[in-house]
């Protein structure tokens, strides 16, 4: 094995655990040391040395400097994108302008993440686990944003010198992430048992009834009871506070007739101390492209049920949209809860990438929802996400992105693709070994959709393929039907990422779960309970607090 390959494999092994477990400390971390010593664990040590001053310092001073330089580069890149849009905005193709607009949007998010991270790092050397996880998540997302921008520009042949800046900016953000993860992220002391069979709020739930324990004013309660035609149960201390409620009813008898109008009415930049802004969307087919922008925080959206409240669109790459902007529903606002809603992209199997939901909303939760499309159905783009008792239908790479995401007790339905295509349930997009990202499929069911089950031609179906170099996906305690290829996983192209990815299975059931004939890649593993517990809600998402406050049921550890 070459020295470079050995180094990459070592990085992959070190990064096979979620962020709190990869904080192997640099010797004498609080003492002055050389850039060469500090940069040993950066993805690109030579680049790291080139951006740090050639004088002794500790990891905190180097980390703060790197974050300040990252912030400066992000500001510069926004100016470059603005100039490019001014130059091309009226003459370039729709897809080119779309890619540039995506980059501008992503760059603004990156500015937010870097500013918050820099302010936190400047204020202290010691962070709580949850605060360290916040910053680790923001820096991971900044790198994801750069990668998404670059992909969009490449796909529309509109790089024009921007790709070099993006490449260097991404490397600088990688230095900031590496130094932060080694300096500020504390070692986690796992105090909870591996086995945690009881779900929070279990007494409120039967399977798939989509009810939340809500607490609201008498006026809001009266509105809720009227629109749902059922009486809201009296709440207790565990109930989720609702600050206000508006209704969306297509016949005009509610507050709004469109979902976007209701979202616009939500307060801006709320801290959630007064509860969630509840949008109740009654049954109907809503043909609109819904967006929850980043300033709309603590929004709760409840529908009348799967296949009752349906949001639908048909944008696709073939029709000139970027993958990033093809989504029927776009979520950027943090602390969002979605319940009892179907989101569809009906572009079809011949239109290429066509997203149903794109989520970049931090600490977002979807419960008892359905996402239906073909290629690239569920774009778990970035930050932290949780899906419980949801259905996902798709074909090629139909759960993809680079969030830290757990899908728990969900139904995943590969469907019939265009002839000649294969199905991949996941295509995880981790590009940096220090990112705290990955996809965990926990306690789910994977079986063919009806059209695939009755297909008149053979379709190969896999658990996933590595979209990016450090792709990370774990399938555990999941039922896998017999239609899965025995090899389990598919390559992206040749031997790309086969040594640096982390794919793992643990204690799955069903005729497709036999690992005897699985791939023999260096990055593939059959893991034990201790390793699997690293990818649970409690350990991977640090989720007991933020998911617990939503009222959505979850299992924090492995299922007994």
UniProtKB/Swiss-Prot annotation:
InterPro entries: Invertase/methylesterase_inhib, Pectin_lyas_fold, Pectin_lyase_fold/virulence, Pectinesterase_Asp_AS, Pectinesterase_cat, Pectinesterase_inhib_dom
Disulphide connectivity of cysteines: 390-410
The enzyme's E.C. designation: 3.1.1.11
GO terms for biological process, alphabetical: cell wall modification; pectin catabolic process
Active site annotation, chain numbering: 376 (proton donor), 397 (nucleophile)
Family recorded in the similarity comment: In the N-terminal section; belongs to the PMEI family. In the C-terminal section; belongs to the pectinesterase family.
Name of protein: Probable pectinesterase/pectinesterase inhibitor 20
Taxonomic source organism: Arabidopsis thaliana (Mouse-ear cress)
Name of the gene this protein is made from: PME20
């Amino acid at each position: 094995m070459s020295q470079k390959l050995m180094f990459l494999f070592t990085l992959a092994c070190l990064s096979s655990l979620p962020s709190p477990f990869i904080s192997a400390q640099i010797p004498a971390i609080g003492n002055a040391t050389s850039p060469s010593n500090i940069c040993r664990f950066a993805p690109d040590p030579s680049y790291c040395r080139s951006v740090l001053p050639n004088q002794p310092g500790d990891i905190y001073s180097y980390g703060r400097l790197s974050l300040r330089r990252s912030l400066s580069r992000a500001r510069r890149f926004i100016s470059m994108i603005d100039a490019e849009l001014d130059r091309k905005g009226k003459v370039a193709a729709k897809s080119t302008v779309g890619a540039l607009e995506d980059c501008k949007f992503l760059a603004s998010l990156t500015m937010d993440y870097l500013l918050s991270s820099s302010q936190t790092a400047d204020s202290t050397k010691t962070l709580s686990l949850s605060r360290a996880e916040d910053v680790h998540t923001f820096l991971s997302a900044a790198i994801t944003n750069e990668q998404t921008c670059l992909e969009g520009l490449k796909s529309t042949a509109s790089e024009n010198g921007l790709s070099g800046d993006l490449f260097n900016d991404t490397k600088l953000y990688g230095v900031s992430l590496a130094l932060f993860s080694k300096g500020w992220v504390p070692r986690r002391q796992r105090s909870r048992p591996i086995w945690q069979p009881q779900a929070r709020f279990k007494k409120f739930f039967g399977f798939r009834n989509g009810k939340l324990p809500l607490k609201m004013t008498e006026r809001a309660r009266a509105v809720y009871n009227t629109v749902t035609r059922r009486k809201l149960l009296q709440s207790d201390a565990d109930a989720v506070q609702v600050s206000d409620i508006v209704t969306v009813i297509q016949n005009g008898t509610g507050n709004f007739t469109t979902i976007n109008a209701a979202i616009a009415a939500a307060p801006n930049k709320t801290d959630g101390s007064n509860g969630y802004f509840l949008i109740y969307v009654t049954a109907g087919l809503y043909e609109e492209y819904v967006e929850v922008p980043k300033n709309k925080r603590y929004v709760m959206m409840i529908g009348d049920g799967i296949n009752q409240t349906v949001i639908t669109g048909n944008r696709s790459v073939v029709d000139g949209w970027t993958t990033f902007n093809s989504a029927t529903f776009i979520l950027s606002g943090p602390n969002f809860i979605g319940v009892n809603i179907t989101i569809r992209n009906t572009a079809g199997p011949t239109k290429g990438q066509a997203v149903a939901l794109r989520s970049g909303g931090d600490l977002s939760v979807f419960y008892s929802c359905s996402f239906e499309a073909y290629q690239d159905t569920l774009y778990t783009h970035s930050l932290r996400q949780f899906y419980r008792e949801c259905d996902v239908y798709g074909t090629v790479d139909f759960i993809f992105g680079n969030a830290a995401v757990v899908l728990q007790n969900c139904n995943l339905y590969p469907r019939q693709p265009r002839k000649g295509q294969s199905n991949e349930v996941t295509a995880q997009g981790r590009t940096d070994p220090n990112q705290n990202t990955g996809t965990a499929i926990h306690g789910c069911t994977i079986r063919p959709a009806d059209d695939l089950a009755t297909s008149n031609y053979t379709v190969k179906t896999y658990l996933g393929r590595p979209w990016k170099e450090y792709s990370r996906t774990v399938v555990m305690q999941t039922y896998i039907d017999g239609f899965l290829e025995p090899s389990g996983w598919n390559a992206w192209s040749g031997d790309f990422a086969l040594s640096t990815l982390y794919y793992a299975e643990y204690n799955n059931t069903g005729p497709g779960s036999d690992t005897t004939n699985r791939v023999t890649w260096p990055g593939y593993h059959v893991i034990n309970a201790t390793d699997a517990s690293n990818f649970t809600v409690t350990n991977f998402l640090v989720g007991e607090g933020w998911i617990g406050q939503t009222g959505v049921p979850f299992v924090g550890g492995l299922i007994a």
